[in-house]
């Protein structure tokens, strides 16, 4: 994937530089690649103990100078609407179209907020992003996101309530709602490891920029890694327009990110 190749290039440049400059003092450096990050499985088989590091930094950020220490907390919901299919020519009084029930449910979702296209900053959202539909059964997958973990349950209760309302409007239908945890706000862990963030800030300054600390309206593998015992903030990599057809990356920002990594190695060695 392009995102993996991007990170590999950055790591290779950093490694070659450190090997070519043995005078640069640094402690042991561990390198990890999480190739399934974009589908939410990047840390499923990541062995933190074997990795053997006290902390880590993902290179998965956006604009030059950004340092991110908090992410969304995230769950996913699958709402499966069940209907009854029969031959459409003889369906009167028999057919219950699960596609229409699901459409009714989606139409009931808030239209004045709680949607990605209507929120910013620290605002959370509910986002229907995929459907698998037939008359008999239609499943709707939704993302639930907020920076405050307790708010996830509030939004999940709302989704379940709206799903039940849709079913009530279509006699003969039913619904099953399943909630799965995706990741949690890494700030809950990083607040207990201020040196991990402070050392990164110092590396930014040595590389000639003041860190811009802003929340990620999304997640990185650092979220899961932090809760697995490996505190992991996120550093910019020059990425823009994530997941869109217009995604692009700044080569200049990538090189600046490498400078930050090199400085970071030295900061940790000097402050050890």
Language model segments and positions:
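Hydrophobic core residues within well-ordered beta-strands of beta-rich domains
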Residues: 5, 75-77, 138
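N-terminal, charged/glycine-rich beta-strand/loop interface patches
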Residues: 17
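A generic structural micro-feature
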Residues: 3, 71-73, 134
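Residue-level signal for alpha-helix termini/capping positions
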Residues: 20-23, 205
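Single conserved hydrophobic/aromatic residue that forms the stacking wall/gate
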Residues: 1-13
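Metal-dependent amide/peptide-bond hydrolase catalytic core
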Residues: 98-272
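Fold-level recognition of mixed alpha/beta catalytic cores in primary-metabolism enzymes, strongest
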Residues: 10, 14, 22-98
């Amino acid at each position: 994937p392009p995102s993996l190749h991007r990170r590999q290039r950055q790591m290779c440049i950093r490694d070659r530089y450190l090997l070519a400059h043995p005078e640069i003092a640094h402690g042991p450096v561990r390198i990890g690649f999480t190739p399934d990050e974009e589908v939410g499985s990047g840390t499923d088989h990541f062995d933190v103990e074997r990795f053997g590091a006290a902390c880590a930094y993902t290179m998965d950020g956006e604009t030059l100078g950004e340092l991110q220490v908090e992410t969304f907390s995230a769950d996913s919901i699958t709402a499966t609407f069940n209907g009854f299919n029969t031959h459409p020519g003889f369906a009167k009084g028999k057919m219950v179209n699960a596609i229409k029930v699901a459409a009714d449910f989606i139409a009931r979702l808030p239209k004045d907020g709680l949607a990605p296209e209507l929120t910013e900053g620290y605002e959370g959202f509910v986002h229907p992003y995929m459907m698998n539909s037939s008359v008999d059964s239609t499943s709707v997958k939704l993302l639930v996101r907020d920076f405050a973990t307790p708010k996830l349950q509030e939004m999940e209760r709302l989704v379940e309530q709206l799903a039940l309302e849709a079913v009530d409007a279509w006699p003969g239908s039913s619904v099953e709602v399943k909630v799965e945890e995706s990741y949690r706000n890494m700030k809950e862990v990083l607040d207990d490891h201020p040196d991990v963030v402070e050392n990164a800030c110092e590396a930014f300054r040595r590389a000639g920029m003041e860190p811009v600390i802003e929340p990620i309206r999304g997640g990185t593998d650092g979220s899961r890694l932090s809760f697995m015992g490996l505190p992991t903030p996120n550093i910019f990599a020059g990425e823009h327009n994530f997941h869109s057809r217009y995604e692009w990356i700044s080569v200049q920002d990538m090189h600046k990110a490498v400078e930050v990594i090199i400085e970071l190695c030295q900061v940790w060695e000097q402050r050890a």
